[in-house]
């Protein structure tokens, strides 16, 4: 079912990991953990497991950027299968909210990314039509979407020779929220030319041409929308809805009745409590929405009535992407130590915001049922699961152990307390598969413990050694003040150093790391250098100051993650400055010793020569930023010198291309540049909008 394409075969620890994980899935283990060191090929290992078990697979990552990277990797491994991408389709999103203290209501404000919306619809279509599906998703997959039953009821299967009139087919298309447009042929549109109907499916790149002869479908053709050229003839095809939230007319009419009933009850409650303002507010807002639903079939914020539309009882869980998978699907949670807690925290944040809206008459109580899954509901939706992480949390290890020992798990298992401890190298925990030996032959960095006294002088000497070899150094401190003072001191004695602090935005942070890789400076000082994206093959030394101060930044997990920043260099080394051998340091040293011994023995046995990771430096995001500033400057100095309209068109094309390539930072910068040009074209003053929730500004999601 799955055809894995790769220019290399499993190597190092990958073959045994693939075999064990595959055996676990086939034997019915509900929870397994893949504990893999940095650079061990965890994604390739999971890809081989997917190929072996032949199950539809959902891969969850904790942010869009990492999800995009995983999507690209799986797409390259499975070019002949359906690899889909399911993340939030908002370029920016400001949820509606009310601040009682200032009596401020913030309207919902958002902009959808059409390409990501297409990919989401493509995901749902693939899950309905085939089993060889891999969906890479962010944690937004736990939010509610349309009902699977409604979606399935609305699809239009057609075939050559089917008795179906053109008029009935057109009516069905409109029910699926397609729009007729005989001029522009965009996704979600259809056009009519005599007995021929051309449809642009919302989840596909191509178009469908359906030719009728009387009351019968005579021919179905797939064609290229831009040129109109035929791509292939089809015997049958399924037309899927143009939107994710679709329902039948019968259900919509029923929903309107139940919404009116809830509205009447809510008004009486407010009037009984002498909250006349809230009663008037909820009456006015809800009746306007009902009017729109009766006339147009949709209203702004219709998702807040999803419980009524789908006919769910109060308090029931929402319909999510999980419902579209068959019962035997495989779940993979990437970077599980970060993703699992994020899944657990989303429900409470959403509930607190909506509760305020309900209490003050902006929304009906049923709006609280338009929400993400809570953690127990998520556990109830889990099927067989593989947790992937270099530092899995205690509860993931415990679930995996219980699943392997008892032989049955419980996706509804008791929620264990969070922990940061990783698997001991000497304990073969059942259900936990380790990837220690890298395909490149690289061994874990050597770890040296040095006393705190004289740590700065020693650090300077070590930094200069690396600088002479054109290698880079990361230095992590405990406090912002220490980091700033150390940076100033190193700079004063002639060392080329920069400080990575929390006030740097995402794009500037990427630029700092890029400059480090290019050799524009030699030393990067920071407090928490564990964040995703610190893939720096040029770094040969990681220095951890005050390593014996037990806590979050010096825990076993933090030490392992920080040390991994030097794991891609042939001469990688980690120096811990400490006077006390804390429990975290002892565990970290034990893990490192075990890994190095195993890696070195494997290399000797197989005559492998380790080699550093080589990776090209990505194009600078600052290029796009400087382009925007340059365009703004040109417009200010003389907007008549350029054709603004054509420039906007060019930038829009670039933005769509960037979104299609999943380069969202570039797309966002281009979008902002387009807005600035449009403001100049309209003759309005430019507005600078900072990221702030309270000041009614836009926040990114």
Task: Outline where the language-model segments fall.
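Walker A/P-loop
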Residues: 27-49
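N-terminal cationic and glycine-rich segments that engage phosphates or anionic surfaces
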Residues: 33, 86-135, 139-401, 427-458, ...
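Conserved strand-helix element at the start of the C-terminal RecA-like helicase core
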Residues: 56-68, 85, 275-278, 466-488
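Conserved RecA-like helicase motor-core motifs
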Residues: 78-88, 301, 434, 472-474, ...
